[in-house]
């Protein structure tokens, strides 16, 4: 069995879909379906069982037997960069992750987890090293601190000549693609611009967006990276992005091209995002490629075109 936490979410459900495509369906999805709309991400997936995230962690902490587990993909988290309840974020993203990590280490179960490019903050160097990290929001900090916790475990194991089972973290950059319709304000720019155009409006970008560039990565490619690392058993913390920074306007132009009409309009930059907003991200893929991962990443033009074709059927 493979367990996918956050399996009803965007990245988690795409990982499940990719596993299904490879013929694997002995999958336990763990999530919180309080927002019942997320069920739509599971309807076309072939899984063995579903469990609420609180029931799951209770059983994990009790050391319950789940039977043979081939791997755990830990994608579950509060991913809202606008959430400032630090106690909630640290309990949900940090403490929960630690419990699950130690469960896996004790049983030598491969543990592949979601980190984030939000760990880097305001920098122009995106290398998986402590010197380049400086989260701008509490979500980013929760991910940064868990990465540091994992690093400490590796250092302790090395000091005692021990080898830990596989632990792999992925610093996701700006992920977009199918199965994100439940995310509300945290859905991708492509998703929001498409909704605007379907409502008969022009696509709207924040003022100053011509200066903002992000590494926009297609969720299908993200899922492929996760499966590559499981199949190859490689540990480490790795950037998961295209290695290219593209302007928000490139996303808007790809959406406009699909619809065959429209022009970009600008709206004021939100006050609540000032000082907590990454204006530039670009994954350094040196470490990912050195590990042997050869997954090719779609450009914004190609990825958004594929995405638009899927959600505008």
Curated annotation (Swiss-Prot):
Amino-acid positions noted as binding substrate in the UniProt annotation, renumbered to this chain: 174, 185, 192, 206-209, 214, 277
An example Gene Ontology molecular-function term: ADP-glyceromanno-heptose 6-epimerase activity
Matching Pfam families: Epimerase
Active-site residues, record numbering mapped to chain: 139, 183
The protein's required cofactors: NADP(+)
Alphabetical UniProt keywords: Carbohydrate metabolism, Isomerase, NADP
UniProt cofactor note: Binds 1 NADP(+) per subunit.
Catalysed reaction, written as an equation: ADP-D-glycero-beta-D-manno-heptose = ADP-L-glycero-beta-D-manno-heptose
Positions of NADP(+) binding: 10-11, 31-32, 38, 53, 75-79, 92, 143, 175, 183
This enzyme's EC code(s): 5.1.3.20
Domain of life: Bacteria
Keyword NADP: yes
Gene Ontology BP term (one): ADP-L-glycero-beta-D-manno-heptose biosynthetic process
EC top class named in words: isomerase
Similarity comment text for this entry: Belongs to the NAD(P)-dependent epimerase/dehydratase family. HldD subfamily.
Oligomer and partners: Homopentamer.
Record text about domains: Contains a large N-terminal NADP-binding domain, and a smaller C-terminal substrate-binding domain.
Physiological role: Catalyzes the interconversion between ADP-D-glycero-beta-D-manno-heptose and ADP-L-glycero-beta-D-manno-heptose via an epimerization at carbon 6 of the heptose.
Name the UniProt record assigns to this protein: ADP-L-glycero-D-manno-heptose-6-epimerase
Native source organism of the sequence: Aliivibrio fischeri (strain ATCC 700601 / ES114)
Gene: hldD
